[in-house]
UniProtKB/Swiss-Prot annotation:
One of its GO terms (molecular function) is mRNA binding. This is Large ribosomal subunit protein bL12. CDD domains: Ribosomal_L7_L12. Signal peptide: none annotated. Homodimer. Part of the ribosomal stalk of the 50S ribosomal subunit. Forms a multimeric L10(L12)X complex, where L10 forms an elongated spine to which 2 to 4 L12 dimers bind in a sequential fashion. Binds GTP-bound translation factors. The keyword Ribosomal protein applies. The lineage of its organism: Bacteria, Pseudomonadati, Pseudomonadota, Alphaproteobacteria, Rhodobacterales. Belongs to the bacterial ribosomal protein bL12 family.
Amino acid sequence: MADLKKLAEEIVGLTLLEAQELKTILKDEYGIEPAAGGAVMMAGPADAGAAEEEKTEFDVVLKSPGASKINVIKEVRGITGLGLKEAKDLVEAGGKIKEGCDKAEAEEIKGKLEAAGAEVELA
């Protein structure tokens, strides 16, 4: 049981690039495909009825690359600094492009990606 807990902690601690590499390994070597939608539901706070504070940190989430996948890959490379293959894999898989940015930066990134043809949301 302790080994499983340690494994879970390691998985949760992965960076975005490491998680993308793990996905690729699971797909290529073991034939495990990501679930459709790829969303993981997490339990909300215990006091969901209380007034929420205004959010100060945002995650930019790619929902769909749209028809212009190449333009979206170029923008993702510029935003994240990833290599071509890593950016392509990230765009094809969808998910978080950038985590923990302020509202202005998140809106700017969202605008760039949408201008390139992607469907993006802020979380």
